[in-house]
């Protein structure tokens, strides 16, 4: 019988607004149980510092030139993670065996073989007196992969544990949207890749025009009118990028210049349809669904709450492909990524594979993450 471990997963996405924290129990294989989830918002100083730093980092040289600021912010980020880890462990009333610490991505460029997350695993281990796994992406990149996406094996676990009929597809709409196609229980049969922008362009447009961080439920975009001319040109331009066969994206791969002259609401509406079409096209291209074969798309991530975006995707799909949100299966769609890194931490500690050729383009199934015990 496999041993079960209690693991805390800490994940901060491209929105840079806070940390999702999840405690789970799992054997690192086909069994898992969610125990406790909570979101912790960054304070205003950390949030603004992260946004400012990300704006400065566009190359490896920029990482070197801003090393002092990066190191200072890394310490603040780690102290914040230590504080919230102690809080969630206390709230959950459980002892944790291991912590999966993703850190905050400030630069990701698969072509240049780099994915930089800030977060000091050694310091976190010392502060928590816990084993910590961090630096999840480096080994995948070292072995020829793109370092992302890493959640597919957890998506596979969710599909199988909830007895969802296969083939099924998990569509995660975070800052970047990614897809996992599950056709069997075998992790090596998984197919996964980044689609393109998820919430990132929408959120950036909102931040530039308002004091808000996102368009709640897509309400503002519903007030606007999409510019079809601008939309079609933007889709053509994106197709040229995607034809380079990139499996992973960074938000720096996209910009808002094509909607610059539009009103706030019209810009949002155009961006919603742009994002929806990219997702729709990727579903059709990658899945090769047979004309009369039903295929379920299960949506997770913050984008599932944007009703305007969801409707824009749904109305374009053929009748044999249909959408459901993961919450319909009594799984909290806000914490899939943090639960995934709790699960990956267990697998990493057990020296189990976390990425595969069809998920990250890595040359061979690869382990990942660095395990530290600094106490």
UniProtKB/Swiss-Prot annotation:
Binding-site residues for ATP, renumbered to this chain:
13-20
The alphabetized UniProt keywords are:
ATP-binding, Carbohydrate metabolism, Kinase, Nucleotide-binding, Transferase
Give the pathway listed in the UniProt entry for this protein: Amino-sugar metabolism; 1,6-anhydro-N-acetylmuramate degradation; Cell wall biogenesis; peptidoglycan recycling
* Catalysed reactions, as listed in the record: 1,6-anhydro-N-acetyl-beta-muramate + ATP + H2O = N-acetyl-D-muramate 6-phosphate + ADP + H(+)
| Family named by the database record | Belongs to the anhydro-N-acetylmuramic acid kinase family.
HAMAP family the record matches = AnhMurNAc_kinase (MF_01270)
Entry function: Catalyzes the specific phosphorylation of 1,6-anhydro-N-acetylmuramic acid (anhMurNAc) with the simultaneous cleavage of the 1,6-anhydro ring, generating MurNAc-6-P. Is required for the utilization of anhMurNAc either imported from the medium or derived from its own cell wall murein, and thus plays a role in cell wall recycling.
Q: What is this protein called?
A: Anhydro-N-acetylmuramic acid kinase
> What species was this sequence derived from?
Pelagibacter ubique (strain HTCC1062)
Taxonomic lineage of this organism? Bacteria, Pseudomonadati, Pseudomonadota, Alphaproteobacteria, Candidatus Pelagibacterales
């Amino acid at each position: 019988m496999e041993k079960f471990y209690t693991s805390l997963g800490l994940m901060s996405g491209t929105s840079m607004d806070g940390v999702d924290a999840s405690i789970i129990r799992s054997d690192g294989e086909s069994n898992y149980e969610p125990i406790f989830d909570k979101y912790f918002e960054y304070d205003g100083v950390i949030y603004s510092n992260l946004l400012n730093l990300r704006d400065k980092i566009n190359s490896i040289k920029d990482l070197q030139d801003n090393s002092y600021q990066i190191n200072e912010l890394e310490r603040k980020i780690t102290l914040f993670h230590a504080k919230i880890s102690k809080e969630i462990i206390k709230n959950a009333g459980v002892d944790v065996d291991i912590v999966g610490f993703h850190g905050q991505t400030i630069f990701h460029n698969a072509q240049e073989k780099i994915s930089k997350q800030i977060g000091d695993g050694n310091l976190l281990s010392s502060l928590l007196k816990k084993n910590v796994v961090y630096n999840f992406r480096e080994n995948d990149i070292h072995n020829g992969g793109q370092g992302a996406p890493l959640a597919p094996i957890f998506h596979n676990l969710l599909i199988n544990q909830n007895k969802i009929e296969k083939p099924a597809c998990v569509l995660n709409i975070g800052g970047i949207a990614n897809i996992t196609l599950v056709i069997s229980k075998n992790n090596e049969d998984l197919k996964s890749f980044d689609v393109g922008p998820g919430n990132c362009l929408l959120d950036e447009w909102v931040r530039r025009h308002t004091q808000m961080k996102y368009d709640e439920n897509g309400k503002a975009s519903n007030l606007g009118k999409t510019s079809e001319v601008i939309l079609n040109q933007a889709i053509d331009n994106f197709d040229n990028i995607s034809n380079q066969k990139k499996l992973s994206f960074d938000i720096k791969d996209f910009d808002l210049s094509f909607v610059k002259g539009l009103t706030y609401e019209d810009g949002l509406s155009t961006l919603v349809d742009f994002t929806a079409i990219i997702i729709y096209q990727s579903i059709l291209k990658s899945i090769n669904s047979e004309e009369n074969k039903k295929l379920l798309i299960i949506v997770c991530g913050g984008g599932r709450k944007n009703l305007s975006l969801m409707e824009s995707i749904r109305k374009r799909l053929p009748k044999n492909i249909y959408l459901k949100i993961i919450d319909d299966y009594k799984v909290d769609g806000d914490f899939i990524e943090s639960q995934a890194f709790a699960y990956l931490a267990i697998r990493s500690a057990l020296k189990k594979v976390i990425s595969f050729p069809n998920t990250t383009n890595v040359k061979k199934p690869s382990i990942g993450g660095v395990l530290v015990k600094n106490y």
